[in-house]
Amino acid sequence: MLCLVVCCLIWLISALDGSCSEPPPVNNSVFVGKETEEQILGIYLCIKGYHLVGKKSLVFDPSKEWNSTLPECLLGHCPDPVLENGKINSSGPVNISGKIMFECNDGYILKGSNWSQCLEDHTWAPPLPICRSRDCEPPETPVHGYFEGETFTSGSVVTYYCEDGYHLVGTQKVQCSDGEWSPSYPTCESIQEPPKSAEQSALEKAILAFQESKDLCNATENFVRQLREGGITMEELKCSLEMKKTKLKSDILLNYHS
């Protein structure tokens, strides 16, 4: 593997201007070169048991020089910790068993442990924390619902409502606290009519039957009154209906045989 890396590096350097200087040596490392747009990108990889401190890549530019400060491969150091939007009480490489402390900038809250230790396998434990903004992301909008509120800074409150035909399940108001909304978001569920009891259904049927009977009585009474006002007796009405019935039958027979 080392031979392959060296051969690759020799080929890349010879492919460019012959005046290119050799990459500066870094103890306990392997150098890998890669040609990119008439330049050589060099990367230092530390051998097992060592850890890189500094910038791992160099670029050979037209000035014929390697344009970066050399890194180091040091024994027993953990990777340089990174804490965006925060501070670490360490200004250099941390040895095995060394501890560091973390603190977030104003407006941010620490998520994770406020300390970590460098282990023998060059890892950090507990894992490195992050600094999360105390402000919140826009809250979720429930299906068939919406919220009112335009600011999502820490301490802000939004209020939830549902569309017509739906009711809110959960807390109507949620508050932004240290980058998170609490309590949990509510949901909007369809309003279901409660099932009617057997007694209520029987009562409604009885009322409907009574109304129909009442309407029938009123219609009969009106019909009889109209007969009397027209001077027509029930016998005359019956005779007239029989004649119309006979005529209707004869018309049907004539149409059938024609």
Swiss-Prot record:
GO CC terms in record: extracellular space
Pfam families: Sushi
Record-annotated disulphide pairs: C46-C73, C78-C118, C104-C131, C136-C176, C162-C188
Keyword tags: Complement pathway, Disulfide bond, Glycoprotein, Immunity, Innate immunity, Repeat, Secreted, Signal, Sushi
Positions of glycan attachment: N27, N67, N89, N95, N114, N218
Domain named Sushi: residues: 18-75, 76-133, 134-190
Keyword ATP-binding: no
Plastid keyword on record: no
SUPFAM superfamilies in UniProt: Complement control module/SCR domain
GO biological process, one term: complement activation, classical pathway
Gene3D superfamilies: Complement Module, domain 1
Principal place of residence: secreted
Residues of the signal peptide: 1-15
Compartment list: Secreted
Role, per record: Controls the classical pathway of complement activation. It binds as a cofactor to C3b/C4b inactivator (C3bINA), which then hydrolyzes the complement fragment C4b. It also accelerates the degradation of the C4bC2a complex (C3 convertase) by dissociating the complement fragment C2a. It also interacts with anticoagulant protein S and with serum amyloid P component.
Subunit structure: Disulfide-linked complex of alpha and beta chains.
PANTHER family: PROTEIN CBR-CLEC-78
Protein name: C4b-binding protein beta chain
